[in-house]
Amino acid sequence: MDQQGMVKKRLAVLVGCNYPNTRNELHGCINDVLAMKETILSRFGFKQDDIEVLTDEPESKVKPTGANIKAALRRMVDKAQAGSGDILFFHYSGHGTRIPSVKSAHPFKQDEAIVPCDFNLITDVDFRELVNQLPKGTSFTMISDSCHSGGLIDKEKEQIGPSSVSSNISPAIETTNKTITSRALPFKAVLDHLSSLTGITTSDIGTHLLELFGRDAGLKFRLPAMDLMDLLETMTAREKHVDSGILMSGCQADETSADVGVGNGKAYGAFSNAIQRVLNENEGAMKNKQLVMMARDVLERLGFHQHPCLYCSDQNADATFLSQP
């Protein structure tokens, strides 16, 4: 319970996209979210009924489309209560991409996005809008094991990022036979796929997304550039309380994340696996920044060239990961 005697809810949405039987197929994403589900059930006090899992396994009744993912996130936010201290958690494993940005002074002139199974992209703007809808006193932790995931919550403060000091650990790559696949989809690959569905010849990705998904398309694609900039400024100005968003990304915005296949068929995401290793080796509560830095160290020791990042307020950087009981 919180200080006011309200019962603290722990709510989660876990999404894994393997894109089976396509040229973009991955192998470890569903394993990632199933492992995370077991972890939050056994260690962090989550209940089975408060966890929604979306995967693109053939037998899955509800696929992780863009609309379904956003609907699940909205349901989670709607269940949260102001002043309750509710813990909201979103884990995504799948492809990520970058698309041309309309925002001024953007360091890479591109926006980050995740790639649901139907390619209805969810961008950093959509996640910013979601965070701004959180009731006061709740928190939203997002782990994205995808390429270009740094900065996936727009305007979130960088705590651990490209400017962070390296730990200088000597790599000691494991000798187990592995197959490494990037969890990145280049913009052109996304554009070509959408164009094959719409039959429209244009490099404007928004045209394709609006044609295919209409009002279910992301906010970035439904608003003209100037209106979007005005909305972003308005959302930032109205955010008076401490920002409740916490993003742990599998890599920097200009990097790729690895999908690792091993001989026994137990594939996994490199970042998700690093998180699991750190948690398994440390039973006590951990600060968010500790978890990310230790995951960085694990990846460096294993020889992976990706650098997990942390984006959140100063206060949340020192907060306990998922408020471990």
UniProtKB/Swiss-Prot annotation:
Glycosylation sites: 177
Disulfide bonds: none
GO MF annotations in UniProt: cysteine-type endopeptidase activity; cysteine-type peptidase activity
Regulation affecting activity: Inhibited by serpin ZX and nitric oxide through cysteine nitrosylation.
GO BP, one annotated term: proteolysis
KW Electron transport (keyword) present: no
Pfam families: Peptidase_C14 (PF00656)
Transmembrane region(s): none
Changes after translation: The two subunits are derived from the precursor sequence by an autocatalytic mechanism. S-nitrosylation at Cys-147 suppresses both autoprocessing and proteolytic activity of the full-length protein, but does not affect the activity of the mature processed form.
One GO location term (cellular component): apoplast
Tissues where this protein is expressed: Expressed in root tips, cauline leaves, flowers and siliques.
UniProt keyword terms in alphabetical order: Apoplast, Autocatalytic cleavage, Glycoprotein, Hydrolase, Protease, S-nitrosylation, Secreted, Thiol protease
EC class: hydrolase
Active site: 95, 147
Record SUPFAM superfamilies: Caspase-like
S-nitrosocysteine modification, residue list: 147
Function in brief: Cysteine protease that cleaves specifically after arginine or lysine residues. Does not cleave caspase-specific substrates. Required for proteolytic processing of GRI.
Family named by the database record: Belongs to the peptidase C14B family.
Stated name of the protein: Metacaspase-9
Native species: Arabidopsis thaliana (Mouse-ear cress)
